[in-house]
């Protein structure tokens, strides 16, 4: 079973930029989208992995995705410190604006624990 990465951000251009950063560090992204519904559809076809998600997507908030996220997937929320302070403990976080190194380290750590 291999772990996958799905990126869901309201601006598809931002999601593609993050995909490029991850690719440069040897991480493969399975899907890039701007809505919770598309992210969950992609996740349903994967074995396990990490959903990198923004606070508010085009069709719902991150908590809606979290409520429907299968147990074999974990969420990484990219948000402001105010939002992070309110996030459940089950959600990993990276504060925006983010440093690429913080993103890479967090994703690698999450994937390691899923393996």
Name these PLM-found stretches.
Residues 8-9:
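Conserved acidic carboxylate
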Residues 15, 36, 49-71, 80-81:
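Conserved phosphotransfer microenvironments
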């Amino acid at each position: 079973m291999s772990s996958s990465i799905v990126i869901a951000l309201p601006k598809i251009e931002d999601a593609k930029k993050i995909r490029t950063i991850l690719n440069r560090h040897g991480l493969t992204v399975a899907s890039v989208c701007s809505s919770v519904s598309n992210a969950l559809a992609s996740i349903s076809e994967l074995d396990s992995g990490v959903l990198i998600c923004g606070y508010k997507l085009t069709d719902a908030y991150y908590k809606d995705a979290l409520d429907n996220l299968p147990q074999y997937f974990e969420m990484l929320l990219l948000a402001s410190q105010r939002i992070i302070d309110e996030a459940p403990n089950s959600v990993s976080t990276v504060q925006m604006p983010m440093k690429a190194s913080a993103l890479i380290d967090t994703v690698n750590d999450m994937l390691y624990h899923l393996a």
